[in-house]
Structure formats: C-alpha cells, structure tokens
Amino acid sequence: MEMSFIDYIKKELQSSYIIGVYHKDNSYFDDLRGAAGERIEDFDGKPIEQKVYVSNDNLIDGEYYQFDWGVEGSSIYDYHYTCLGNINSIDKRRMLEVRLHEKMEQRGTNRKDANQNQEMINREVTGAPHTYIYELLQNSNDYPQKDTNGNYIPVSVKFILTEHYLFLVHSGAPFNLRNIAAICTVNDGEKRENIETIGYKGMGFKSVFVNNDYVYLNSGGWSLRFDDKYINPEGSYKRNWQYMPIYTEMSDLDNEIIAVLNSISNDMNVFFALRHVRDAKENIPNLEKVFSDDKILVFIPHVYHVEVIVNNNIKKIDKDRDKWIVQDYTIQVDDEYKQILKDEMLKGNKIPEKFQKITNITISFAVTKEGEKIVPLKDTKIYNYLPTEQPLYVPFLLNADFVPDASRKGLPDLEWNKKIMFDAGGKFAIWWASLMDTESKFDLSSVFDLLPDMTGGDIFRNKFIEGFKQKIETIKCIPVVRDGIYKLEQLSNIIYDTTGMMDANNQVMADEDFYNISKYSKCLAHSEIRNHPRFIEIQRIFATDDNTFGFDNIISIITECKDEFHKWVKDINNNISFFKFLFAKEKITSVISTVSDFFLAESGELCSPEKLYFNIDEYLVDIGMFEDLLPRMNIKVRDTLKKEFKSIDGKFKHFNPVDIAKNIVEDFEKSDYASRINDLKKSVNFIHFLAVAREGSLTYDGDLPKEYPFYDENGKICKDVNLLFRKDKFGEDLKKRVWMNSEWITFIHSDYFNKDTEDVYKFLENRNIPVITPRI
C-alpha cells in the first residue's frame, strides 16, 4: 500500500507529540521540534517555518510546551501542523533520554560517520589553547536577560577553578530547550533568528570538549552532562559522546560539583562544570592568557564583569568604558553583500545560516585614552567580538561580523570577510575624523598616532587600507585653523608643502602671515599634526599639482605678492628665518637668481645683494660718519648667518676703499661733508682712512678735501692748513723763540698719528703737512 505524505511525517517523527515555543500575541507555537528536541524539517530538508495556532490563555510567553499534533493539507506543498490538545510543559528528562537513545542506537556506518564528523569538528575548533575560554565568554554574552523596560541587563561571569574542575557560572538568561538542543548537535542554528548573538553556529562551544572528558550543565531546570567515560566504557565501541546528553540527578554529581553549585548566588542562572582529561591546573595559563588582556571585554556587548577564582585568589575584570573609546557602525546588507553570500554558497564555502538572514553588519573600533590623549595599542588582533589570532597591524581594535573559522586562528579567505574589511577601512576613516571634529576634543597628534602605515600586507590588511584610502579622499578629515577658526578640511584642500617652509618645528612664516601674504584659498594643516609622519605619508600619497607648494611657489609669492612679502621680510627676525631656511635647503642661489630684492639693509630698506656691502665694519671705524653713503647688510642678519653668507659673498657689492675715498673727497665741499666731521676723533679717523686706502696695488693719491677741519694740538680747528705742521723737537723749539710769532706755526694734533703712524706721516707730508725742517 502506497504511503501518504502524512504517513511519511509520522514515520519521521515517531512520536504522538511535538514541541513548540509559545507566543502570547496571536497565541501560537513555532520553532517546532520533535520529541528529542530536534527541529522538524520540511520535505526539502530545511527547518519548517510554521505557526500552530491554539486557544489557551494560560500558557507562558516564550516557554516551550509539548502537545499532540495532527496535519491538515493535501500534499507536501500544501499542509500545516495542528494542535490536537494535551498541552503540557516539556518533560526535560524524557527529551534528553529520547535524544540519548537515538544516539546510542547508531550502528555501523552511522556510528562511524558520527565519529568522523566529531573528529573533523575537533580539528576545526582546535586553535589556540585558550580558545575554549573565549567560547565560554561568548555563550555567557549571547543570552542576556532583559528588565521590565526591555533593556538588556549586564551579565556577570565567574570562572572558578577547583582541584578537578573549571566552573563557569553567569547571570545571563537560563538555558531553554533551543539552547540545549544546540549544544547537543552542530549547526542546529539556535542563533539563526537572533542576529545579535556573537556566536554563529554552535561549533565554537564544542571547543570545551577538546581537553575535557566531562561537561556538566545546570540551568533553567535542565540538569545534564556529557560524559566520555559513561558513554564509552572500557572495551566498548567508541561513540561521539560530545552529542549525547545524559540526564543527571544531584545524586549523580560528586561532592566537588555540589559544593560549588550550592555556593553560587541565585542570580547566577547558568552553571557549567568542566573536568580536564589530565589536570585542571592546565586551565590556569589559559585563564591568565585571556584575562591578562584588558581588551577582552571591549566588544562583548553584554558581559560587564568577570571574576576568576583560582586557589581562593580572586581576579576581577570590569568593562572600563572611561578608559576606552568605542565606536559602533552599522552597515546595511545590500545587494552586493547578498550576492557575495550567494556566490560563496555556490562555491561550497560554509556560510552560517545566521548570515543568510542578517540585515545589518556591525563594525566597531576601540582604543584606549588617557585624558585627552589617545593611546595607540600594540600587537592587536582582528576581533569577531572576541579576538581571533589574525593580526591586522594597526594601533587600534577592529571588530566586525566576520566569518571566522571555529578555532579563531584567523579569518577564512572569504569574499564576505574581504568586503567587510574594505568597508571597515572606510568606517575607520569616518571614526578617525570624528575624533577631531571639535577643537581640543583629543590631542591631535595622538589621533594621528591611530593611523596605520599605508604599506601593504595580507589580503585583509590590503582591503582595509584600500577602503580607508577611498573614503579619506571624500571626507573632511584634516584639522586646520584659519582666521582663528578651527575646522576640518578635505585632503584636496590642504597645502602639501614640499619646501619645509611651514614645517611646524622650524616654521619660517607664521600661518596668519602666510595666508595674508600668499592669498592662498587652500589651507595649512594644523601645526600639531603638520610634522606627524602619518600625516606626511597621507599627503605624499594624495598630493596633486593643485595643492603642492614648492620653491617655484615661494618665488611667485616674492614677486606677485611683493608689497605683503616685503612688509613681512623687513622684520629682522623674519628676514633671518627666511635666509636661514633658504641656506638650509640649499636654495639660496636658485632663488636669488630669479628674485633677490629681499636682502635687508642696515637702514631697514630691502635691496638686491649687488647693491649692498656685506661687511665694511673695519672701514666704518674711520668713515662711520658717511655710513648713509654705504648701503650694507643688516648687521644682526649678517652676523647670525655669517658662515652661511660666505657661500654667496660674491653676490654682494664690492667695497673699493680707493674709489670711496675719491668719491667722498670729490663731493666734500659740494655736499658739506665738513659738517659731518665735527670732532677730533672723526677728523683723525677720516685722515687715517685716506692714508691707508688701498685696492690691490693702488692707493689714494688725491688731494686733501678743501676746507678740511684739522685739529691742532690744543684740540681746536685749524683755520689755515698752510701753517699746519707735524710737531717735532726742532719745530717745538723754533716756536718758542722770542722772535717767532706763535701764530706762524700750528702743530697738528698728535692723535692723527696713533694708528699706522708712518702711513699717515707720509700721507700728510705729501700733502704739505710736514715737520719743520731746518734749511742749511
């Protein structure tokens, strides 16, 4: 007799009742399950998505019930389950015993296949030795309780190590049937409907079985264990005990478990006991590894407090939000993401069902802070809410809805992960810029410390950097101050100074002066980040001809903004800074070959170097009264950079003492230069200058200036130079003779001969100021 589709359903379920979770709104059951707690499948092999409506107001919302069932419909394409009554709370013991019986009945190839699957899973979940601690934390997080307002209640977690066991207890929601079924199998999909969970396919939890041969759970009225020695007694065929739940009475527990179970507070709703295959103390380094890392709780949404108790020593770990800057972003799963999932599944890649229904992706960043300073992190890993072993080599934490491998060794080379990493780079650019959106929000240099270097790496780092670069070009992300106003500007509007003139450590020109002189519409980066290596690297990558500032631009400023530039460079300190910069950059020659009228004279005027004497200090001792006739380099500028200016001394005006002497003497009477020589010292000095003036082999061979104010030995101006003599003993005696009129002989002041005496003697003697020589 041919079987109907209903007969096939009955044959599959082999039970008069099924199980479902009750929803008070509209009064129905869903998440339909068989007597062993397994999800009922449709004829296409996928879990059935049906609602079984009932009329019963006494049931509790969210609780699982078992009820007698029936089927209405005409074919496998058109049927639905119905409730025939006999609604009761589930018999937890019976459900576990049914499941255990099903597993124990596996024979031959079924048993071998199950064992091989378990071995494969063990290999997949075997990563770093401490991975199982992560998974226990993950399970603590994934089902927090809610308060009366629907807000999540923070979860507290305890790890307790005793002689033989590692215990995990937490205050999250108690286990329900769905949770129990999930840990009794793999890929049951208990989290597929809850996209907020950080676990993703139930396999991670299986890591607790890698080094433990006994795992006990007490939660939500469930008491069960997974026990290798019970399932596989010596001499029996080996079975995959990790999926065989054993209903456990309190009398089945040893005193060590009972003691801890009785000691925990009532707010702890989940109790695990893990017995190590060798020595429970082997858990200690793994606990230390995980909880020595103060980053461990950053991305776990609901766990806020953990206690680790080893040998009665308590270590407390709290989520310190004051220490961390954490930013979450949500990306909608668009058509591109959906196509990636579709393509990955066509390739045969494992994509958890949770991701097939996910509508939004979370990308998060975190970094520590100390006051207003951001503190970059070292040796960071990529997070999938808990850390993987995959490095990204960035100074901050990155967390996202990646698909990791179950061992958390790294990220599989999936297009989904690459796409998220690309988008993460873009979101990082936005987050990074937001840290600078207001002045004094954070120390700007420390914000730039967050930037990774732009060099390549593995595929995930490359994707991240690619996404970052693409986004950073389009957003305002570089801080500037202009006209006293702080703001962010796009990179394309930031001046890329290749000259170093605006270098923050050796700034030649103040920002305000630069803007006032150059009239540039583009902006200089904030001085706090201008010399930061990451900023320099970014500018180098994104520089264009349009925003590059080179030495040609400096020349343009000097020539095209002449009035403003001259006003600025007339300041002595500015002039020194500008020359120091040109010399340091070895650009002085090339610049002054084009424009050079920015050399500061001692008079305060600006000149080209060929119009200025560089150093005539030794001559001005004698002819300082004619300084206005001798344009020279500003003394402070010259002396500050004397060594540097030697490299261009040929550019300055040459000082020829002989020509200067001739010019002054020629114009002496016409220009009334005598009025400048208004004391003995000046008169002495100028005569000395004339006497020693030389240019090569040439000397001054001209006359004395007419009406030159010579001073006699009494310090008075001599009115008749023809009566002026150099004093010697003969002349002195002669003047004393009684028959000699004293006015006939005037002796020139002896100061004229204090320096270079012979030269001055000779010079004056040749110009009719001799000694009185007796004629015989």
Task: Label the predicted regions.
Residues N117, T148-I153, N255, N266-L274, ...:
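Amphipathic alpha-helical coiled-coil/helical-bundle segments that mediate oligomerization/assembly
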Residues N262-K369:
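Glycine/threonine-rich ATP-lid/beta-loop region of ATP-binding domains
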Residues N86-S263:
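GHKL (Bergerat-fold) ATPase N-terminal catalytic module, capturing the glycine-rich phosphate-binding loop
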Residues N86-T109, Q356-V375, Y385-P387:
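Long, contiguous juxta-domain segments that are non-catalytic but functionally important
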Residues Y28-H80:
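Acidic, low-complexity, intrinsically disordered interaction modules
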Residues V71, Q138, L161-E163, H170-A173, ...:
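Short, flexible loop/turn elements at secondary-structure junctions
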Residues D7, G20-Y22:
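Structural detector for short beta-strands of small beta-barrel domains
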